[in-house]
Regions:
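Multi-pass, polyprenyl lipid-linked donor-dependent membrane glycosyltransferases
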Residues: 138, 159-167, 191-226, 249-256, ...
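Start-transfer (signal-anchor) and selected internal transmembrane alpha helices
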Residues: 1-97, 276-285
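Membrane-interface anchor segments at the N-terminal boundary of transmembrane helices
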Residues: 43-53, 159, 370-437
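Loop-to-helix entry region of an early transmembrane alpha helix in multi-pass inner-membrane enzymes
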Residues: 137, 141-145, 153-170, 190, ...
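Transmembrane-helix signature of polytopic, membrane-embedded enzymes
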Residues: 175-198, 424-428
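Membrane-proximal stem/loop segments at transmembrane-domain junctions that anchor or position
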Residues: 297-385
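Transmembrane-helix motifs of polytopic, lipid-linked glycan transferases
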Residues: 162-183, 221, 410-414
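Extracytoplasmic catalytic/substrate-binding loops of multi-pass membrane glycan-assembly enzymes
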Residues: 102-118, 122-146, 154, 158, ...
């Protein structure tokens, strides 16, 4: 008993030293971020997101470590259920009041697209006919479809906000349940749920667009399904369904799914698991194909179907920044082409290729490096490479860009089953993380908010390894 106590004290002392080191690294790192922000190298949102994640993660670990004695006390299932329901109800009421009475601070691009598209559709004849935006970003159109449906159902965007707030609260509870499944500690799960609710309330009217709210539930749902008690076959089928649905709502849902497969790679090396793996990927393909068919039918009903015969100039016109109140990245003056309802292929090739080159020249040295790194990685994010779709090799670039990403992810997953050395395995994870970041590019700042549950779960796992035996 004494030896065990001595080991625990030694572990606590080690944890204290590590926490002090983290604090020493944390403050200069944040100062560096804000200096870079003031110099224009990074966006304000990047600093806020990184700062919030580090602060909340370190704060969570510290609180759990500080109150570990009370946290380790058993908690009845009845009290646990009541506590989670209480957190859910109180947070939902508070966030609903915020949605109803606080002015909207972050206008979603998709809402602006919808409103402006309806407005411009009234004078469709003067709009340039492009078919870029929703051809290249079909998953974003899913957001427009969902928001449009909710808007028609409730009659205002307040109703849309309340529905997305409900999804955020459900995500928080799932984060708590997942933490309980991993750590086996109900008190830790309640703490995680509360912290997640506090963070989501802070972000509700500032840095969390509707698309993130709608997509947030899927990553944590995948983790919850994986950690819950269920037969392995049913588990992978449910995960495949969650990934398929989440992919249509928010494409980045696929990232935690791949991460989960990689982290669990050692467990899937055995031959008897091949059946489960095959069933899982087959289910994912079936669900994805079915949802893709349904999705295309919905787009046809909404007259957003995209092929060589149908144009959506007003949608693209807004997406590229004309009359865009957000002041987003697509702020190009389209007046040159506005008087040509049907510009030739040569006209738009020259115009947008020239704009892309001009944009690169105007960027700083750091910006150019990031641009070319993104170009090499064929990232999907909000970079100027998107405008290169209009050059004569647009289809080739699109195919290379997409399939390079899928090929890289496939190789990473396959590597999971081959590499057994932990050092190389962690290197593989690091490479995967870099590719994932380049894939998200500058848009990744706000998408990181979707993965706060994953951060909390990992924090819970660390606590379990350190203190809970």
């Amino acid at each position: 008993m004494k030896q065990r106590t001595d080991r625990l004290i030694l572990r606590m002392n080690t944890m204290t030293r590590k926490f002090s080191i983290l604090q020493m690294i944390f403050i200069p790192l944040m100062l560096l971020f804000f200096i870079c922000m003031n110099m224009g190298f990074v966006k304000y949102n990047d600093c806020v997101v990184v700062y919030s994640i580090l602060l909340l993660t370190i704060g969570t670990i510290f609180c759990i470590w500080k109150f570990k004695d009370s946290i380790n006390k058993p908690l009845s299932q009845k009290t646990y259920s009541k506590s989670l329901w209480g957190v859910f109800i109180v947070s939902f009421v508070i966030q609903t009041l915020v949605c109803m009475y606080v002015p909207l601070a972050y206008y979603s691009d998709f809402i602006i697209v919808r409103e402006q598209a309806i407005h411009m559709a009234e004078d469709y004849s003067v709009m340039p006919q492009y078919d870029f935006y929703f051809h290249s970003y079909p998953y974003q159109l899913s957001i427009v479809v969902i928001i449009n449906f909710l808007y028609e159902l409730f009659g205002s965007y307040k109703g849309v906000e309340i529905v997305t707030t409900l999804l955020v609260n459900i995500s928080a509870i799932l984060a708590g349940l997942t933490t309980c499944n991993i750590t086996g500690n109900r008190r830790v799960a309640i703490v995680v749920a509360i912290l997640f609710e506090v963070f989501s309330t802070f972000c509700l009217k500032t840095y969390m667009p509707y698309s993130a709210n709608l997509g947030m539930i899927f990553p944590i749902l995948i983790l919850y399904i994986y950690t819950t008690r269920m037969s392995r076959i049913w588990k992978v089928v449910c995960i495949a369904l969650a990934v398929a649905v989440g992919y249509r709502v928010k494409m980045t849902t696929i990232i935690p799914f791949i991460a989960m497969v990689m982290f669990c790679g050692y467990k899937l090396l055995r031959e008897r698991d091949l059946k489960t793996l095959i069933v899982g990927f087959a289910s994912l393909m079936i669900f994805s194909y079915a949802l893709s068919s349904i999705h295309n039918c919905m787009l046809e009903k909404m007259h957003f179907v995209n092929d060589e015969k149908i144009d959506h100039g007003f949608i693209y016109y807004v997406a590229m920044g004309q009359n865009n109140p957000t002041g987003g990245q697509y702020n190009h003056d389209l007046s040159v082409l506005a008087d040509r309802p049907f510009p030739s292929k040569k006209d738009r090739d020259e115009y947008f290729l020239g704009k892309a080159i001009q944009s690169v020249k105007e960027r700083s040295a750091i910006g150019q490096l990031k641009f070319f790194a993104a170009k090499i990685a064929f990232c999907w994010g909000e970079t100027y490479i998107d405008h290169l779709y209009f050059c004569k090799y647009d289809k080739v670039l699109l195919i290379i860009k997409h399939y390079t990403w899928y090929l890289a992810m496939t190789l990473m997953v396959i590597g999971t089953f081959i590499i057994r050395d932990r050092r190389y395995y962690m290197l593989l994870l690091g490479i995967w993380g870099v590719i994932a970041y380049l894939y998200l590019s500058e848009a990744g700042a706000r998408y990181v908010l979707m993965y706060m549950p994953l951060v909390y779960v990992m924090a819970g796992w660390v606590v379990k390894r350190l203190f809970i035996r």
